[in-house]
A protein has these predicted regions:
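Short beta-strand
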Residues: 86
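Glycine- and aspartate-rich repeat motifs characteristic of hemolysin/RTX-like Ca2+-binding segments
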Residues: 1-63, 83, 93-94, 110-129
Length: 129
């Protein structure tokens, strides 16, 4: 069972499904293949180890700031043609029309692949790895 502390929601070292609330605006997935989603509002989220899925809000206002996105992780979105990835400073921004859906901290927009048919965004394979 996920542990709850103050404004933080913490997962376990197994696979968890975590949803933020108006009182839980920092979400830590920890280990396991976690699914993290957020309602309206602004949230900071960490998937932790393993392959995590970050579900963006379709409709409504607010976004998640993904603090540790890495190869193997996935961002789900509406699949809408108006969704795009922009580089703003050191972060990649997932934007639908004029509404921000997610900010991916420390990631270059050019390193992300957007698949409209599958409605997912993933990290590009590193050709140097």
């Amino acid at each position: 069972m996920a542990k709850k502390r103050r404004n933080k929601l913490r997962g376990t070292n197994g696979a968890d499904e975590l949803t933020g609330t108006s009182r839980k605006r920092r979400i830590y997935g920890r280990g396991g293949d976690d699914i993290i989603s957020t309602p309206e509002g602004r949230f900071k989220v960490w998937g932790g180890e393993d392959n995590d899925t970050f579900k963006t809000l379709n409709g409504g206002k607010g976004y998640m700031k993904i603090m540790d996105f890495e190869a193997g992780d996935t961002i789900t979105f509406c699949g809408c043609a108006s969704t795009r990835i922009e580089q703003r400073g050191k972060n990649a921004w997932i934007v639908k029309g004029d509404d921000v859906k997610a900010v991916v901290k420390g990631v270059d927009a050019g390193d992300l692949n957007i698949d409209f048919d599958q409605a997912v965004i993933t990290m590009s394979a590193d050709p140097m790895a």
